[in-house]
Amino acid sequence: GLITNPTGVDNQMKSTIDILHEAPNVNLVALFGPEHGVRGDVHAGDHVTDIKDATTGLPVYSLYGKTRKATPEMLKDIDVLVYDIQDIGCRSFTYISTMGLAMEAAAENGKEFIVLDRPNPVGGLKIEGNLVEDDCISFVSQFKIPYLYGLTCGELALMLNGEKMMAAQCNLHVVKMKGWKRKMDYVQTGLQWVPSSPHIPHPHSAIFYPVSGILGELGYMSIGVGYTIPFQMFAAQWVEAEKLAGNLNALNVPG
């Protein structure tokens, strides 16, 4: 079984779905879709439905619909559950919640879990923000980790499993990257960026998202979502632009 979306590609931009489906020694029997779906064609926050994949004919089970966690029925025909999604290193991005709940499901149903690791686009040195409080645990803050957690998805999986931060621990294996250094941002990896969601079109979007995403969720100002610069601005009719700019400049924030 494969949990993935359009970001699951090799360095020739071939989908992991196609790679595993065509591999002679692999029997890919099911796909699992996170938020936005396996093919990335579902709007943010909209429920993803169970479908048949048009390209491979495989069943696609939703992990962002009636259930957020794979059921025994979904997992009955698989031996190994593989996770291959490019994340952005921010706690409120839902893919890591999907990964964690899938790891729990794998543990509870006796399935091996494999993470195909990918770079953290903001690097592995930036760790910022408070831990989520107990009464605020949700699908957009599933684990008690900093808002910017400074780990790759494989490293995070190892921590969640090793520190027993989930209800059950799985038989976990991480396929590590070659050549990645913690100081690298995504551009420095030389890899082609595939949008991790419709509103994360560029690798630098991962830098803007943690800053403005929460403001957008509060619903009282625009952060550029729906325009060509998602998360790169904040604006509202009641903002006095020159006064705000003066107050911000007076802080003398470096950069």
Task: Cite the ranges covered by each PLM segment.
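Glycine-rich, charge-decorated loop segments at or immediately adjacent to ligand/cofactor-binding or catalytic sites
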Residues: 40-44, 114-136
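Conserved anion/nucleotide-ligand pocket segment
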Residues: 136-210
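A short helix->loop->beta-strand "cap" motif at the edges of active sites that frequently abuts
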Residues: 24-26, 106-112
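Glycine-rich oxoanion-binding loops at beta->alpha junctions
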Residues: 48-78, 90
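N-terminal phosphate-binding or glycine-rich loops at protein starts, especially the Walker A/P-loop
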Residues: 1-26
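Glycine-rich, aromatic-lined ligand/substrate-binding cores of catalytic
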Residues: 180-255
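Glycine/threonine-rich flexible loop motifs
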Residues: 87-99
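Short internal beta-strands
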Residues: 27-36, 116
